[in-house]
UniProtKB/Swiss-Prot annotation:
EC number(s) recorded for this UniProt protein: 7.1.1.-
Protein name: NADH-quinone oxidoreductase subunit D 2
Topological category with respect to the lipid bilayer: Peripheral membrane protein
Catalytic reaction(s) noted: a quinone + NADH + 5 H(+)(in) = a quinol + NAD(+) + 4 H(+)(out)
Cell compartments where the protein resides: Cell inner membrane
One example GO MF annotation: NADH:ubiquinone reductase (non-electrogenic) activity
Domain of life: Bacteria
Amino acid sequence: MSEAKGVGGIDPRATPGSAGAGERPPMGTLSPRAGEGELYAPMPSKHMVINLGPSHPAMHGVTRAVVELNGEIIEGMKLDIGFLHRGFEKSCENVTWGQVFPYTDRLNYVSSIMNNVGFALAVEKLAKLEIPERARYLRVITSEIHRICDHLTLVGAMAMELGAMTVFLYGIEARDLLWDRLAELCGARLTSNYARIGGVARDIPEGWQEKTLKVLDRVVAIREEIGQLLNRNRIFIDRCLNTGKVSREDALELGFTGPCLRASGEPYDVRKAAPYLVYDRLDFDIPVGSNGDNFDRYLMRMEEMRQSDKIIRQCFEQMAPGEIIVQDFRYALPPKPLVYGTIEGVMAHFKLVMEGIKVPAGEVYSYTEAANGELGFYVVSDGGGRPYKLGLRAPGWPMLAALPVMTKGSLLSDLIPTFDSINMIGGEVEQ
């Protein structure tokens, strides 16, 4: 028997329960070998810090997020902006009042007409200028078309970055149909330069209304199809529901406006709270959410597109023929027959082109409901031909500043739909 025993005196022929096998001690009583305990000691860990953007496609090329991660949980975030800073406010102070419009086009460049209209209303309020009725309706029509374009872009981009490429293509198709109509009216798809102090640049061409209504019918069909693809999509719902939540109280405290505020349950819309142009004559609803998450912010855009379609159709029904710009040649260029045929017309044209309009001295804050929320212009005039001071309240800035609060404690993957749902546009945020 002694020959059969192996190393350590263990009989290899022994089986459990047989003589010589013995009982195995419980695991808890086994003592570690020398140095083995070090393997089980808790290891100190450090949070990982990663850069998301500015070249990351989900950050739209204009924002850098320095994200601190504990595993996949976001522990903190610092935002680095300024990659698209152009000195908007100072640039506007170096040109005439009428030359500011091309700069406003490049704020929220997806819905530029709203920026045109916002600035024009501020100057007209300071100058106490009443614009023609037809110009009011044309401003509303074009603004609401651009609101639809903006929301289509957000919904399409948000779906694409969650893997639904088809929705993005549908959204871009509908947006391009609307942009084609605006290009026919304004001469540009993106940077419209359509509004003027005292009215609009040009009237709608013959047949434009009928073509626009046909395009709206097609856009309605595409929007409904997008809703069918996303509203009950399990992946989309799981990625958006209960992520990026902001309560009504927090949204107000953080300075939210627009769809993001309404998604949190606060029914504030400038078009209802402080009506401008002809919004007080129109029948439309303000959609309001209850959960304040990414899914509610998506639903806000979908419903607002439906309401914008309703507004545009009412404007076409109510709009009557008439002037599209004031006939006060201190603010608007005289018609070409007067310029070419009278000395008064030549002089008025020359002074407006060379010196710009003279806005009475004073200051004013004017605000409108842009696609992302309250767009405000603070304008100061010293009575000269250029703005003395111009300040901008960008609707997207409070939402972007709140992004670290909205994502703290959530998964890294939740950052993408949250960033998309606030619709940060670098042009308006960084100016």
